[in-house]
UniProtKB/Swiss-Prot annotation:
Cofactor(s) the protein requires to work: heme
Keyword annotations: Endoplasmic reticulum, Heme, Iron, Membrane, Metal-binding, Microsome, Monooxygenase, Oxidoreductase
Gene Ontology CC: endoplasmic reticulum membrane
Family: Belongs to the cytochrome P450 family.
Name of the protein in its database record: Cytochrome P450 6B3
EC assignment: 1.14.14.1
Length: 498
């Protein structure tokens, strides 16, 4: 018995040492930070699914208001959380090269070849090839298609609001974003079965799992052992979807001017030259297989569908709470549409300046992109400090913390679109607003997301008003199981005909 007790004690001691061996790292370097907990570091609440990870980082941001750089532990791995905006400006822009990688790579066979998760030369090459798909010129051709999807969505809204005016707004606008992404990105006109299939995929893509924590404990292990952060069913679906779409198109263009037309042109090239540091460098080109294209289609869908749906959920919620802002927005929509014969065009959206401010303020208060993560490719001393981040370590920028900091946004809980009038923008630090990150690794689909949301908002508010619901009158309790931050149980509003 004594032998067993001794063995258990020794094993417990070894495990404790192993999972706390790095916890004096920042203390030795005189870098302030929260006290880590064995095994979990500073992420106990998110690892145990008590809070979303983004809210854990916001809490750390709030806890150290006088620090430029905060030393944290993502599980057992030393990392930093940046608070100083001048330092933050260096990371994605001025000193981009040392921080070009996100550090969230995983198996290329598990959709890891997508442009968001790819790092290094692979990311550069994909970015160069796929950026032209999101130019203003390309997106302008999609606006009529977005408008058609919006008209169908209004018919759906009519049906559901007649049955019950009180609606889970997230569930409702998801119908628009799924249908719009399917039309604009895949050239598909969804039937009810396909819509249901895509809705069922939601839980596999946007429910958090423990692969992230595992990769923090052992950085790079997912890529090394061909692991993925998504279940096989997701890859199988997008592989089949890609194959079916290209077989259906048979190399011909559609009359819709969707994204598949542009992807087909890339597909015919067979390969993409990887980025070279030197002209004479011998680098094997990236083969544009259907698997690589499938990974891009997956990320276009995942990023374009759920982030927009979540943003619109908060936008309509705030309009319901602030009827004066809603009145002003409706007046602008009515006036501008009357000048354009009721048609939504590029010029029409450009004239809706207050709509743009409402969009920006929504993402200020609720930055669904959550936080920025970058992996150091070299040792780097943060400007204005003597703090060094080592090669392979991770930096975190709490977008939610910055954009809800009263230092930059007085009374941050107030929803105030005038924070984004030209004068206020001019007087604010550029890194005080980072919903799409910044620099070369910012969100590639920024314009698409904005236009998608604006088209839907214009369609809805030209016919309806949104009013508060008693179901969503209290303080939000965010769902720790959701990848993008949403309250448990959703957000409800009443949709009322004007």
């Amino acid at each position: 018995m004594l032998y067993v007790i001794t063995l258990v004690t020794v094993l417990a001691g070894l495990l404790h040492y192993y999972f706390t061996r790095n916890f004096d790292y920042w203390k030795k370097r005189n870098v302030a930070g929260p006290k880590p907990i064995p095994f979990f570091g500073n992420l106990k609440d998110s690892a145990l699914r008590r809070k979303p990870q983004v809210m854990v980082y916001k809490s750390i941001y709030d806890e150290f208001p006088n620090e430029k750089v905060v030393g944290i532990y993502r599980m057992t791995t030393p990392s930093v959380l940046l608070r100083d905006l001048d330092i933050i400006k260096h990371v994605p822009t001025k000193d981009f090269e040392p921080f070009a990688d996100r550090g969230v790579e995983f198996s290329l066979d598990g959709l890891g070849a997508n442009i968001f998760h790819a790092d290094g030369d692979r990311w550069r090459s994909l970015r160069n090839r796929f950026t032209p798909l999101f130019t203003s010129g390309k997106l302008k051709t999609m606006l009529p298609l977005m408008s058609q999807v919006g008209d169908k969505f209004i018919n759906t809204s009519d049906e559901v609001s007649q049955t019950k005016s009180e609606q889970s707004i997230h569930d409702l606008v998801q119908i628009f974003t799924i249908t719009n992404i399917a039309a604009c990105a895949f050239g598909l006109n969804l039937d009810e079965n396909m819509l249901k299939t895509l809705q069922d995929l939601d839980k596999y893509i946007f429910t958090v799992n423990y692969s992230g924590e595992f990769d923090m404990l052992y950085p790079g292990i997912l890529k090394k052992f061909n692991g993925s952060i998504f279940p096989k069913v997701v890859k199988q679906f997008f592989d089949k979807l890609t194959k079916d779409i290209f077989e259906m198109r048979k190399g011909t263009s559609s009359c819709q001017k969707d994204m598949i037309d542009s992807i087909q042109e890339l597909r015919q090239q067979k390969t993409v030259d990887l980025w070279r540091k030197h002209d004479n460098e011998d680098v094997k080109p990236l083969e544009l297989t259907d698997g690589v294209i499938s990974a891009q289609m997956f990320i276009f869908y995942a990023a374009g569908y759920e982030t927009s749906a979540t943003t619109m959920t908060y936008l309509f919620y705030e309009l319901a709470k602030n009827p004066d802002i809603q009145d002003k927005l409706i007046a602008e929509i009515d006036e501008v549409l009357s000048r354009h014969d009721g048609n939504i065009t590029y010029e029409c959206l450009g004239e809706m300046t207050f709509l743009g401010r409402v969009f920006d303020e929504t993402l200020r208060k609720y930055p669904v992109g959550d936080f920025t993560q970058r992996n150091a490719k070299t040792d780097y001393v943060f400007p204005g400090t003597d703090i060094t981040i080592k090669k392979g370590q991770t930096i975190i920028v709490s977008t939610w913390g910055i954009q809800n900091d009263p230092k930059y946004y007085p009374n941050p809980e107030k929803f105030d679109p005038e924070r984004f009038n030209p004068e206020n923008i001019k007087n604010r630090h550029p890194c005080a607003y980072l919903p799409f990150s910044a620099g070369p690794r910012n969100c590639l689909g920024l314009r698409f997301a904005k236009w998608q949301i604006e088209v839907c908002v214009v369609k809805v508010l030209s016919k309806y008003r949104v009013e508060p619901s008693n179901k969503s009158s209290g303080e939000f309790k965010f769902d720790p199981m959701r990848l993008f931050v949403l309250p448990k149980g959703g957000i409800f509003v009443n949709i009322v005909r004007r």
